[in-house]
UniProtKB/Swiss-Prot annotation:
Record protein name field: Uncharacterized protein C3F10.06c
A cellular component annotation (GO) from this entry: nucleus
Single annotated GO MF: tRNA adenosine(64)-2'-O-ribosylphosphate transferase activity
Entry similarity comment: To yeast RIT1.
Alphabetical list of InterPro entries matching this protein: Rit1, Rit1_DUSP-like, Rit1_N
Superkingdom, taxonomy of origin: Eukaryota
Pfam families given in the database record: Init_tRNA_PT, Rit1_C
GO terms of biological process kind: charged-tRNA amino acid modification
């Protein structure tokens, strides 16, 4: 009789945990809990925290997305990001009187740092900015900072000590402070919910309520078999390792057929679904973001479909996938540190091509800027460059566009930051790396910029 090898058993669990069937069953299980939270707050707007949280909310709830990084809440690294302001949430919170923000975490943690610290820091910073600095007499006795009760007192104290500095950063970021003060008519207060919570419909009349939902149950070692399959806590995390290209959108459109598919056939099933989705004639460019009032659209290359024949448009394709449509200009630019120098190298040529168009790109019905990363970096940064050179801060076309050779005389870091904030407010997936932002600033603000325009 073979001896039991605990190391082999652990390895088997890790292998099973990476299989898409167990991941998707776990996600579907957790999504039922999220459904119950949404049902408890029927007027609140559901929000998914990219990328993990995106999987846990059924598309029938029409969620919007945000990007709060857990690393901004890591112990000793607490931060308020002026690149990820997520101010589009204020429109929703005032309309719906509250939000439900969904995320998850793996490996036995109670909740992700994004929910326990990053978002509470964001809330406290906005509250203090408006109700201590901009409108100090509106709610003079209101508590403005809230952290979860399970955080150690020393960590709470350290975070609270940094809040005034975060407010300073926000006020110096170039955002429209008058608009911020007008939107936030009362302070925001977070409420934390996990599968271990007693579910209620609690909210706060004196505050806008933001319900922070951890979708997955906390289980020892991150795995459990109590539901008849290998339950993976935070199963949606690291989707590159298990999804085989499946997206949350395709999953929720085909949930039943995916979850009932035999395990050994699931990868083929996913491949067929992705192929049929790409070839669907009913798709439109609704998945791209329109940077109103300009004609610029940004988004993922998979979300582009040729507009009607009578539409005057131009496509700036920064992906490796050629769309083979008319008026397409291809400049593949990868994401991350490797993409930043490529972006800097290609932009003068892109600008030269744009300036040679007849009619000009800004007189067309649409200019589509697409990449392979949901316009998180490359497409958003290219849109940022175009806005800085051709538009004012109200997104209206300049009478005389700024040439790249003269941009350092007309633009400042604050101006660039203000345009970035406007893009982020419209396209919440915008989250350029430091390397890409340095490339943008180098092109626009450096006296050594190559003059090609």
């Amino acid at each position: 009789m073979d001896e039991f090898d605990p190391l082999d058993a652990v390895q088997q669990i890790h292998v099973q945990a990476r299989h898409p069937k167990n991941r998707l069953l776990s996600i579907a299980h957790d999504a039922k809990f999220v459904d119950s939270v949404i049902a408890s707050y029927p007027t609140f707007k559901p929000v998914v925290n990219e990328r993990c949280g995106t999987w846990y909310v059924n598309r029938r709830h029409a969620p919007i997305s945000v990007y709060f990084k857990s690393t901004d809440g890591h112990t000793g690294q607490w931060s308020f990001s002026c690149r990820r302001l997520n101010l589009h949430l204020l429109n929703e919170i005032t309309t719906c009187d509250g939000l439900i923000i969904v995320d998850s975490t793996r490996r036995g943690k109670r909740m992700p740092d994004a929910l326990s610290k990053t978002i509470p820091i964001w809330i406290a910073t906005l509250n203090k900015c408006v109700f201590e600095r901009l409108r100090p007499h509106s709610f003079p006795n209101a508590r403005l900072a809230f952290l979860p009760p399970f955080l150690p007192d020393t960590e709470k104290s350290s975070i609270l000590q940094r809040l005034d500095g975060f407010v300073d950063s926000l006020m110096q970021s170039g955002i429209d402070l008058d608009a911020l003060a007008a939107k936030l008519t009362k302070p925001i207060r977070p409420l934390w919910v996990t599968p271990a919570s007693r579910l209620t419909s609690a909210q706060f009349e004196e505050y806008f309520t933001v319900v922070l939902v951890t979708a997955s149950a906390q289980v020892q070692n991150g795995y459990s078999r109590e539901h008849g399959f290998l339950y993976v806590q935070g199963a949606a995390d690291d989707e590159e390792e298990w999804s085989h290209g499946l997206t949350p959108e395709v999953f929720w459109q085909n949930t039943e057929s995916i979850l009932t598919c035999p395990e050994e056939q699931l990868e083929q099933k996913i491949s067929l679904l992705l192929s049929s989705t790409r070839n669907s004639p009913t798709m439109s460019n609704s998945s791209l973001t329109h940077l109103l009032p300009t004609p610029i659209f940004v988004g993922d290359v998979t979300g582009f479909y040729p507009p009607p024949e009578n539409t005057s448009y131009f496509v700036l394709n920064l992906s490796n996938t050629t769309l083979n449509v008319k008026n397409e200009l291809c400049f593949p630019i990868p994401s991350g540190k490797k993409g930043a120098p490529v972006f800097r190298k290609h932009f003068p040529s892109i600008l030269q091509e744009l300036n040679s168009l007849d009619p000009p790109f800004y007189e067309r019905d649409a200019i589509f800027i697409v990449d392979e990363g949901n316009a998180k970096e490359a497409a958003s940064c290219l849109a940022l460059m175009i806005l800085c050179l051709y538009y004012d801060l109200h997104m209206h076309l300049l009478a005389h566009p700024i040439s790249l050779s003269a941009s350092q005389s007309h633009l400042t870091k604050q101006t660039v930051r203000q345009f970035l904030v406007k893009i982020t407010e419209l396209h919440s997936k915008t989250n350029p790396s430091r390397a890409f932002l340095l490339a943008v600033n180098s092109l626009l603000l450096s006296a050594n910029t190559i003059a090609t325009s």
